[in-house]
């Protein structure tokens, strides 16, 4: 089709949403998929493949990344795979098996073969706290939720444990019962705010980054910090050069310096550091307090290990250092640098930046300094913003200063979804862990059912890729800049390839994608095959080529395994629930069937052998191997667990070091290094990208869109922040609204006094509402959105009788809005409104009002008055089932007005659009480095640069400004006031009568 684009019209690749489906047998569909895999791999391999990809307009860097292998255009995603490790993560095993196909098509040896690209989950959802690897080197720190009860000071920031973690919220409530203090930081008066001792309201867009910097300043200035902890476990005593902004290296200071790390130390023996990695990170320098001399310090020199060496580093020092070559440089402790840096974040400036009262900021600083243990919990309310990296780093800073790390009830955590394949951790003594399942070598699979998982031969032929690049127009972040010309901001370890084949399971991928309508309109027409594997009819199914019906969890015919990020339980189940109601199969059986068909077509037994025990109906052999090879499950036997040897049948405790699970317990109590270059908790990053982008220090930045001020401005006068702006000046950014990618890379530094005088052109054009998109309690992402009672409960407009035929289903999606803001726009409670973001790129690029698809894609929904939200904030719950071409046609033509597609039965939750109508992909440069040193996800080893769900592009749907326009009245047939607002007048927001006001103020309570 690259050679003849007219075929995309002829066969409806450009209009999948108007095509229909045919039923096929499992054998037929397996054959179609297998033959398509072979054809796509062949089509995009070699020089002809490169030529075709070039004709399709892909960036040269992406084409080069294929390495001439068509298999690299094939993308696989196991959606939320921890919810079913064998079946759902099995999609990545399928991706690894593609090396067999590549070796055949390119006629290469196994060692030269390549597999597919593995798409992420955690980062693509925008759920990772992307700054955490910069601080401690781990993908993310999350505790068991029963540790919440041990906290004495609990701070929730952008987190809603009341509504969004209902099974575990009782642990949070126990804090109050046990005498702890609860604080909530959020723009709106949220459910957790109602449980709090005090609530700090802030301007959206992560203005509260400044709060944590101000708190840190107060703790330092007032000497409320834990000095031994700061010296022993943070990078604040290390010396930094003021010329290069790099940490001072021991080899540069001491003549004939011999590296100081012992091979018997934990860096090598426990954490898996290699010689090449050590050579890159080196040793560091402190100034000894007792002698006044400079001393080398290694990443193993933490905690008592440092003290036992007689080292007592200075915190407050600056001066000149003579280098080994005789030259001199100015250097300072990082502590001294932060004293300068934090001058921009006094109480007055911080209160102006975020809108919080100065007294409350000061109170929180005092509480964190004096109440122990203290914990800060962040969530998607933070991680869904562009500068979450900085905010995550900022929340750690006061905890680092006060020693609230590695102890029960203390820490900074970011629970946001059950994502952690790393629970099945690999170590040399245990075996390959998780990779023993997804990355077993397809050229040498173990066919002995009695073989230990430790002995499975592992080789990953795949490479990770962020679906965010697909969201981004199937493009890397490569920008034409005024001063540097065409510049690539996507590191080699992150570089995507063109997408020609998609296979995913357990995810409503298109519905949940940022810029979803842009994908449908502009990106997916170039994809040759989209395979959706799921348990319900979704919009993604409508826009796919093949939909494979998977069995639900209760219908599994074979054993499956799962674990959790928020509790310590391993769970195995299957084969004892309901028989499948329809012609569905377990996920692993679906994958195995296609593999078997590939082998039949290619006359190669290795494809079936790779799934041997699944095809034999014995996937528990793979589960046993997983248990054998993982540090957290080694020595467990499947049959023992199923027999109830460790408790309830099917359950056992994961073998963590502590109960509850306390991240970094070993670091603090056993003096092990953290998983960073310094071995310490890092308040500073000296990687080249961070220095270039102005983020070597933790700093407050405005977003590239969701701000009234200069897009992406760095609020700082620190002379040791020296960003490159690539010729994109403040004047240019304020004169007109520049392209989103240009705003993304604009790095301009100024004081708050200057920044608050600047303007965002989009704000000036009337896009003055921040759009928050939290999750609802009535769906999981988008799953179960079509359930009747979920629809009814999910909004104020639920009605099982659908008296108003405009309801798309038994309910209608709603937007929460401050009553005064709505009334100023002539909008009544219950009215329908259009919600629009920047029309230059949303709901999709090149949208015009006369395009029929624009009508489908423009967001239209109902307003719910909610005074809990400040004036310039609207809130729309995340991921309802979006409007599609078929659902729009249905509600416009059906007598009953339901938005249910005629041929598929797909039930939309909106008449028009989706909350994704107002989102786009923002490709954050700091998420795409090749130089960040951190721990690998699933093994005791280190790496530099990108890894999916670990250090990769985190999508940020909240980075948007919107305009709200009334569409039609909320009353019956679009006339007059919404019936409830009329009949319940006096009880609804903005219409409260005297009785209601008395009730709200507590005046109806009579004390005796």
Predicted regions and their residues:
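Catalytic or ion-translocation cores adjacent to nucleophile or general acid/base/metal-coordination motifs
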Residues: 191, 206-214, 533-543, 549-583, ...
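Acidic, Ser/Thr-rich peripheral helices and adjacent loops at domain boundaries
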Residues: 427-439, 549-563, 865-867, 884-891, ...
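Phosphate/diphosphate-binding loops
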Residues: 519, 528-529, 535, 574-595, ...
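Long, low-complexity segments enriched in small/aliphatic residues
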Residues: 619-797
């Amino acid at each position: 089709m690259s050679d003849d684009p007219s075929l995309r019209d002829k066969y409806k690749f450009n209009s999948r949403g108007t095509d229909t489906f045919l039923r096929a047998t499992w054998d037929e569909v397996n054959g179609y998929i297998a033959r398509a895999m072979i054809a796509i791999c062949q089509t995009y391999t070699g020089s002809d493949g490169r030529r075709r990809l070039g004709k399709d307009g892909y960036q040269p860097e992406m084409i080069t990344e294929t390495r001439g292998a068509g298999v690299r255009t094939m993308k696989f995603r196991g959606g939320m795979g921890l919810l079913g490790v064998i079946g759902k993560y099995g999609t990545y095993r399928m991706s690894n098996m593609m090396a067999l196909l590549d070796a055949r098509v390119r006629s290469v040896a196994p060692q030269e073969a390549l597999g597919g690209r593995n798409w992420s989950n955690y980062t693509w959802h925008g759920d990772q706290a992307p700054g955490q690897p910069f601080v401690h080197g781990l993908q993310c720190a999350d505790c068991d939720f029963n540790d919440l009860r041990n906290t004495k000071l609990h701070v929730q920031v952008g987190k809603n444990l009341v509504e969004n973690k209902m099974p575990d919220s009782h642990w949070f409530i126990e804090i109050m019962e046990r005498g702890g203090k609860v604080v909530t930081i959020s723009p709106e008066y949220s459910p957790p705010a109602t449980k709090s001792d005090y609530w700090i309201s802030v301007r959206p867009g992560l203005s509260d980054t400044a709060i944590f910097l101000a708190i840190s300043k107060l703790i330092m200035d007032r000497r409320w910090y834990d000095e031994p902890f700061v010296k022993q476990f943070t990078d604040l005593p290390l010396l930094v050069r003021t010329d290069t902004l790099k940490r001072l290296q021991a080899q540069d200071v001491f003549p004939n310096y011999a590296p100081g790390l012992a091979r018997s130390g934990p860096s090598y023996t426990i954490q898996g550091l290699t010689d090449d990695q050590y050579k890159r990170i080196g040793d560091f320098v402190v100034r000894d307090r007792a002698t006044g001399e400079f001393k080398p310090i290694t990443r193993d020199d933490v905690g008592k290990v440092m003290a036992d060496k007689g080292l007592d580093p200075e915190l407050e020092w600056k001066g000149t250092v003579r280098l080994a070559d005789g030259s001199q440089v100015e250097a300072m402790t990082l502590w001294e640098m932060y004293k300068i840096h934090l001058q921009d974040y006094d109480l007055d400036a911080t209160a102006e930046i975020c809108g919080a009262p100065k007294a409350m900021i000061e109170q929180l600083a005092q509480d964190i300094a004096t109440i122990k243990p203290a914990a800060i919990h962040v969530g998607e309310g933070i991680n869904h913003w562009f500068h979450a990296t900085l905010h995550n780093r900022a929340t750690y800073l006061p905890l680092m200063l006060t020693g609230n790390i590695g102890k029960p009830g203390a820490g900074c955590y970011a629970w946001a979804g059950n994502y952690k394949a790393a629970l099945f951790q690999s170590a040399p003594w245990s075996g390959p862990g998780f990779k023993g399942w997804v990355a077993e070598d397809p050229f040498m699979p173990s066919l002995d059912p009695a073989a230990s998982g430790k002995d499975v031969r592992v080789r990953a032929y795949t490479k990770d890729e962020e679906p965010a690049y697909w969201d981004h127009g199937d493009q890397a972040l490569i920008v034409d800049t005024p001063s540097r010309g065409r510049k690539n901001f996507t590191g080699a370890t992150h570089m995507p390839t063109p997408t020609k084949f998609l296979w995913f399971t357990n995810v409503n991928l298109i519905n949940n994608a940022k810029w979803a309508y842009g994908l449908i309109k502009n990106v997916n027409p170039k994809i040759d095959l989209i395979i959706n594997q799921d348990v319900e009819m979704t919009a993604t199914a409508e826009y796919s080529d093949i939909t494979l019906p998977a069995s639900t969890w209760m219908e599994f015919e074979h054993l499956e395994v799962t674990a959790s990020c928020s509790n310590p339980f391993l769970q195995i189940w299957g084969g004892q629930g309901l028989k499948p109601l329809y012609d569905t199969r377990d996920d692993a059986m679906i994958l195995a069937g296609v593999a078997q068909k590939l082998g039949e077509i290619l006359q190669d037994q290795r494809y079936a052998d790779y799934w041997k025990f699944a095809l034999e109906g014995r996937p528990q052999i793979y589960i046993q191997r997983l248990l054998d090879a993982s540090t957290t499950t080694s020595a467990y036997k499947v049959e023992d667990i199923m027999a109830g040897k460790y408790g309830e049948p099917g359950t056992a405790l994961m073998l963590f070091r502590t109960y509850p699970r306390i991240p970094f317990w070993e670091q603090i109590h056993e003096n092990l290094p953290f998983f960073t270059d310094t071995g310490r908790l890092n308040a500073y990053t000296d990687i080249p990208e961070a220095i270039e982008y102005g983020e070597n220090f933790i700093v407050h930045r405005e977003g590239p869109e969701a701000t009234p001020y200069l897009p992406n401005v760095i609020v700082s006068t620190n002379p040791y922040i020296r960003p490159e702006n690539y010729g994109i000046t403040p004047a240019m950014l304020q004169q007109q609204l520049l392209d989103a990618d240009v705003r993304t890379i604009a790095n301009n530094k100024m004081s708050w006094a200057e920044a608050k005088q600047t303007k965002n052109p989009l704000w000036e054009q009337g896009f003055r509402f921040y759009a928050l998109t939290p999750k609802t309690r009535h769906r999981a992402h988008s799953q179960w959105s079509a359930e009747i009672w979920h629809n009814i409960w999910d909004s104020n407009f639920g009605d099982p009788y659908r008296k108003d035929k405009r309801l798309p289903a038994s309910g209608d999606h709603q937007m929460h809005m401050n009553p005064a803001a709505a009334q100023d726009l002539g909008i009544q409670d219950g009215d329908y409104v259009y919600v629009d973001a920047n029309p230059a790129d949303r709901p999709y690029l090149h949208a015009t009002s006369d395009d029929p698809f624009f009508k489908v894609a423009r967001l239209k929904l109902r307003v719910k008055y909610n005074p809990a939200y400040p004036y310039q904030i609207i809130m729309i719950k995340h991921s309802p089932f979006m409007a599609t071409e078929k659902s729009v046609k249905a509600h416009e033509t059906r007598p009953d007005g339901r938005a249910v597609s005629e041929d598929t039965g797909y039930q939309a939750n909106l008449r028009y659009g989706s909350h994704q109508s107002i989102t786009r992909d923002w490709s954050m440069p700091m998420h795409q480095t090749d130089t960040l040193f951190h721990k690998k996800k699933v093994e005791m080893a280190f790496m530099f640069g990108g890894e999916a769900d670990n250090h990769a592009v985190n999508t940020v749907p909240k980075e948007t400004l919107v305009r709200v326009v009334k569409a039609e009245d909320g009353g019956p047939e679009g006339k007059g006031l919404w019936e409830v607002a009329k009949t319940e007048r006096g009880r609804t927001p903005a219409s409260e009568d005297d009785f209601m006001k008395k009730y709200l103020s507590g005046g109806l309570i009579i004390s005796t």
